[in-house]
Amino acid sequence: MSFTLAIVGRPNVGKSTLFNRLVGKRLALVDDRPGVTRDRREGDARLGDLAFRIVDTAGLEEADADSLEGRMRAQTETAIGDADALLFLIDARVGLTPTDRAFASLARRSGKPTILVANKSEGRGGEAGAMEAYELGLGAPVPLSAEHGEGLSDLYDAICEALPAQTAPQEEDEETEEAEANPNRPIKVAVIGRPNAGKSTLINRLLGEDRLLTGPEAGITRDSISVEVTWNGRALEVFDTAGLRKRARIEDKLEKLSAADALRAMKFAEVVVVLMDATKPFEEQDLRIADLVVREGRALVLGYNKSDLVGPAAFSRLREEADHWLPQVKGVPIVPLSGLTGRGLDKLVEAIAATYAVWNTRIPTNPLNRYLQEATDSHPPPAVSGRRVKIRYMTQPKARPPSFVLFCSRPEALPESYLRYITNGLREAFSLPGVPIRLTLREKGNPYADKDK
């Protein structure tokens, strides 16, 4: 469900930088000066799986201090009136000012859900300002760096909390319907992994050019900029994530890929390629990143880069290790490749397309419940406290990833081992290798129990 957010706050707190980051284009000047523009800027924004309209109240930045109760307020109230929720920005390095407090008063009186954002929180310089923001009475501030892209996952959570109805997953996933209506649209792909695994080399080989290594200019989001490429007739939208920064920034700031970087990259992708160095596969960080992909519900492909440096025996061991360490995506595709020479890229794109198709799988209710009947007949659920749990039926409300609802008499009594049995059976019966499978339990009573009472 679409919604509108308005970015409000005093001048120079980073509203335009955040606007550019969420929109993914330089639609707003980052260092606005009075007179540059007097119009509110609007754009279509995306954060993870959230798509929404964003309004940058640029008119606020052109107002003089003595017009705070006049023209500034009129611009603010127009933006607030059109918005479903507000992103109220302060500068964490400066702390609160009288202007901040005046805008906070407007936000409170509006009655609109307000997300307090302590921008410029990178480093220790913003800690005091972020703590001071509690005085505004707008709840806990979200520490953020719009310039560096830090804290976007926390902002995502805050938006979902402020607008639960608009951000809740729909029974019929709108994104799934869009994909089914246009099966030829590009697959959204992010390539992530440890430093020196060869991400930049691989992506530039895939794109056929090196231009992204010079990076987007400061202020334009690195998380949502994307480039479309066609490889052997298959359209891909490759996202410019943390691995595509300037060489200097890679050396200075990306000495290791943090969980936050991986999470931000995933939220803009449908298929995530976790790239591993064949000479040092499945280190702890590889597993942590792959686990994040699975928990986010994205389709996963493992890229075995620099595979020309090891023998075939090492690849066989990798298959065993993948199924051992990542049982929740058993059968995940593993592609040996070389980003340097381009060997294996055809297989990689084929694996991306195949995993994407599995990720979009929908299973009709009849075969789904035939499987359930066979599974429960051959291995009934265990009795708990002398009472057996009654498994009634199963449905699939959504795909991307395949998600199922199991109706039973006592959901809390079903052990995890039995849920794994059902999930593994689904994977095998309906050919769902390498993608997360989500299984939700719901209680379903006997509809005729009270019929004669």
UniProtKB/Swiss-Prot annotation:
What keywords sit in the KW lines?
Answer: GTP-binding, Nucleotide-binding, Repeat, Ribosome biogenesis
InterPro entries assigned to the protein according to its UniProt record, in alphabetical order: G_ENGA, GTP-bd, GTPase_Der, KH_dom-like, KH_dom-like_a/b, P-loop_NTPase, Small_GTP-bd
Residues at which GTP 2 binds: 193-200, 240-244, 305-308
Tell me the Pfam families matching this sequence. Answer: KH_dom-like (PF14714), MMR_HSR1 (PF01926)
Which annotated residues bind GTP 1?
9-16, 56-60, 119-122
Domain EngA-type G, residue spans: 3-167, 187-360
What GO biological process term is on the record, naming one?
Answer: ribosome biogenesis
Query: What Gene Ontology molecular function terms does this protein carry?
Result: GTP binding
Q: Which CDD domains match?
A: EngA1 (cd01894), EngA2 (cd01895)
Task: Output the superkingdom of the source species.
Answer: Bacteria
| Disulfide partners | none
Domain KH-like per the UniProt entry, residue ranges: 361-445
Q: Which PROSITE patterns match?
A: G_ENGA
Q: Which NCBIfam families match?
A: GTPase_EngA, small_GTP
Family, as annotated: Belongs to the TRAFAC class TrmE-Era-EngA-EngB-Septin-like GTPase superfamily. EngA (Der) GTPase family.
Cited function: GTPase that plays an essential role in the late steps of ribosome biogenesis.
Q: How does it assemble?
A: Associates with the 50S ribosomal subunit.
> What name has this protein been given in UniProt?
GTPase Der
Taxonomic lineage from the root: Bacteria, Pseudomonadati, Pseudomonadota, Alphaproteobacteria, Hyphomicrobiales
